[in-house]
A protein has these predicted regions:
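Conserved ATP/PPi-binding loop(s) of AMP-dependent carboxylate-activating enzymes
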Residues: 445-449, 460-494, 533, 630-631
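Gly/Ser/Thr-rich phosphate-binding loop
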Residues: 247, 357-362, 371-438, 451
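N-lobe entry segment of adenylate-forming
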Residues: 1-115, 122, 126, 208, ...
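Conserved AMP-binding/adenylate-forming core of the ANL superfamily
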Residues: 80, 98-157, 174-179, 242-248, ...
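Structural core segment of the AMP-binding/adenylate-forming
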Residues: 157, 161-248, 363-364
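Conserved pre-ATP/AMP-binding loop-to-beta segment of ANL
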Residues: 96, 223-226, 237-272, 279, ...
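Conserved AMP-binding/adenylation subdomain of ANL enzymes
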Residues: 291-309, 317-358, 373-376
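AMP-binding/adenylate-forming catalytic core of the ANL superfamily
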Residues: 169-194, 209, 353, 360, ...
Length: 657
């Protein structure tokens, strides 16, 4: 958090007032802030009343044993009932829940399905019955490793219906990453598909599941497989004693399923994220508070109306796909688009035009990609249905904000730049579209009912015009309850820096207006295309290669992905110079160990790494090199000449095309 960065941010003077029509009919008005401040618990109790409960709560919040929160104590609820059944019961069974758009199968023709709420209720009930027949009981964990097809939402809701916490693993992660997550949460059933489509080509998923399951001993009892691509699973690709086709057991199951109401604090899902230790961190979210937080913020931040068509482009393997594709929108009975593919030129704008999307929620990485392609592409489509735009995953720079507003939003759509985390479960900082004037690059203000602050090293509020650490002072409904199986690590990771404060790991600044600017991670977790990856985990993957002795990884600024992985490696003496293909070899190795998203953009083979006398690697100096800056203060290094050696190698560094 340099002084230069902080001072630059305060110069943004452009403002965009809420459209008058939107402001007049906004779901949430200015008075919500004062109402929430006067009685936070009453505010969230009112938000919880938007849901259907089996039994009402005796106590809104139990914070008697911090940092372990309990929300809506004594209440019972079922997430699937709130996302599906209650909308059918209210007479909205014919309303489309999902406009699903698959990858184009051939030029100009896409695989599409419309799933109504009545359809979804039947599918979820059938899947719940099928899982019960496979021995899944309340409390059992189920791993899900699937492409972006309707069945992944069905699988999640079927698990929620049964009270079986799901752990969804991003389909781009490796077999090793999947195995570690299956093992950590002790999942006995894995739901997957034969494959998915990416950029028009079939991509296999089942082989990675087979490899992962083989690493977990006899832990996994069944693998339930959706036929998506119809591709040949190959010799040994089907275990008749373990593997079950979805269409064999789900399609034939009964559509009648009596749901059980679960305790408000019953585990809903475990979401794994790369933590600073390099080992997967299982974030536990429970049911009542999480549903309250996600459904309310989806309704408030996106100003959702009955006739809106909403589209969140996130993959369901990430938390945004949980909170703002599955539980938030479906909890609110929204109609939404779900897309299997990647953002090819013009494809997204075609979908917005075809389905008359009115609310669009995507990441700055995608926006910057479209900027590079040129405005003539979106200009060729009718985007007049859009009325609100959202941004998620990382701070959006002012230039991208303006382009997004002008080119995609036609200079009429408010932008909600949202800040939240896997851990927070729900959006915590965002403009309210009918209340807040938008300021390019700023996430603006904490939402009603949340207590955000920016503090210095002594946990004192820094005040307007200053930067510091982003913290949360009071509990919120969708907050993580703990780390799966490790309460102590939960306390150490999030609550140990300052007593009573949740430290988000992000730096932030309050500008002269008191608006919040996010400055990115202050620890060693990188933000690549809106996805959090641990430098430690990537370093571990590099060092596991037989030619590598030591590695250091930094996140360097990248105009497209926000940050890019840059690695510095010392080879083993036996490896010599590693050979001409060493860089590509190491990239492929990281992709195999973790996933393609973690593949370094740049790898530099160096003779030594900059270390302090205590042996700590000075990553900030490596970041200077990766970002082509003048190297900073080297006085604390054990050998300051090391940086001259590394700088000497800079011209020979190999970067990804």
């Amino acid at each position: 958090m340099s002084d230069q960065t902080l001072s630059n941010l305060s110069r943004e003077e452009r403002r965009f007032e809420p459209p008058a029509e939107l402001a007049a009919h906004a779901n949430v008005k200015e008075e919500a802030y004062a109402r929430a401040d006067s009685d936070r618990e009453a505010f969230w109790a009112e938000a919880a009343e938007r849901l259907d409960w089996g039994q009402k709560w005796d106590q809104v919040l139990d914070w008697s044993n911090p940092p372990f929160a309990k929300w809506f104590v004594g209440a019972t609820i079922n997430a699937a009932v709130n996302c599906v059944d209650r909308h059918v019961a209210a007479g909205n069974g014919d309303k489309v829940a999902l406009h699903w758009v698959g990858e184009p199968l051939h030029e100009g023709v896409a695989d599409t399905r419309d799933v109504t709420y009545a359809d979804l209720k039947d599918l979820v009930s059938k899947a719940a019955n099928a899982l019960t027949d496979l021995g899944v009981k309340k409390g059992d964990r189920v791993a899900i490793y699937m492409p972006m097809i309707p069945e992944v939402v069905v699988a999640m809701l079927a698990c929620a219906r049964l009270g079986a916490p799901h752990t969804v693993v991003f389909g781009g992660f490796s077999a090793d990453a999947l195995a570690s997550r299956i093992t950590d949460c002790e999942a006995h059933v894995v739901i997957t598909s034969d494959g998915g489509y990416r950029r028009g080509a079939a991509s296999a998923l089942k082989p990675a599941v087979d490899e992962a399951v083989a690493k977990t001993g006899d832990l996994v009892r069944n693998v339930l497989v959706v036929r998506r691509t119809g591709q040949d699973l190959g010799e040994g690709g089907w275990n008749a004693e373990r593997d079950v086709w979805w269409h064999d057991v789900v399609d034939s199951a009964s559509a009648d399923h009596e749901p059980e109401m679960h305790d408000s604090e019953h585990p809903l899902y475990v979401m794994y994220t790369s933590g600073t230790t390099g080992t997967p961190t299982g974030i536990l979210h429970t049911t009542g508070g999480y549903l309250t937080g996600t459904s309310y913020t989806h309704w408030a931040v996106f100003d959702l109306k009955d006739d809106d068509v909403y589209w969140c482009t996130a993959d369901v393997g990430w938390v945004t796909g949980h909170s703002y594709l599955t539980y938030g929108p479906l909890g609110n009975g929204a109609t939404q688009v779900m897309y299997e593919g990647t953002p090819e030129r013009g494809r997204w704008w075609q979908i917005i035009q075809d389905y008359k999307v009115s609310i669009f929620y995507t990441a700055p990485t995608a926006i910057r990609t479209f900027m590079k392609q040129g405005r003539e592409i979106p200009d060729g489509y009718d985007l007049s249905s859009l009325r609100l735009l959202g941004s998620v995953g990382e701070p959006i720079n002012p230039e991208a904000y303006i382009w997004y507003r002008e080119v995609i939003g036609g200079e009429r759509c408010p932008i909600v730049d949202t800040w939240w985390q896997t851990e927070t479960g729900q959006i915590l900082i965002s403009p309210l579209p009918g209340v807040t004037a938008g300021k390019p690059g700023s996430a603006m203000k904490a939402l009603p009912g949340t207590a955000i602050d920016v503090v210095n090293d002594e946990a004192q509020s820094v005040g307007e015009g200053n930067g510091g650490y982003l913290v949360i002072r009071e509990p919120w409904p969708a907050m993580l309850r703990t780390l799966w199986g490790d309460d102590q690590r939960f306390k150490d990771t999030y609550w140990s820096r300052w007593e009573g404060l949740y430290f988000a790991g992000d730096g932030a600044k309050l500008d002269e207006d008191g608006d919040i600017w996010l400055l990115g991670r202050v620890d060693d977790v990188m933000n690549i295309s809106g996805h959090r990856l641990s430098t430690t985990e990537i370093e571990s993957a590099l060092v596991s290669h037989p030619k590598v002795a030591e590695a250091a990884v930094v996140g360097a600024a990248d105009e497209t992905t926000g940050q890019a992985v840059c690695a510095f490696v010392i080879l083993r003496e036996s490896a010599g110079d590693g050979g001409p293909d060493i860089v590509e070899e190491l990239r492929k190795h990281v992709a195999h160990e973790i996933g393609a998203i973690a593949k370094p953009r740049q790898i530099m083979v160096v003779p030594e790494l900059p270390k302090t006398r205590s042996g700590k690697i000075m990553r900030r100096l490596l970041k200077d090199v990766a970002e082509h800056r003048e190297v900073g203060d080297v006085t604390t290094l054990a050998d300051s000449a090391v940086m001259d050696l590394i700088k000497g190698k800079e011209g020979a560094a190999s970067a990804e095309d």
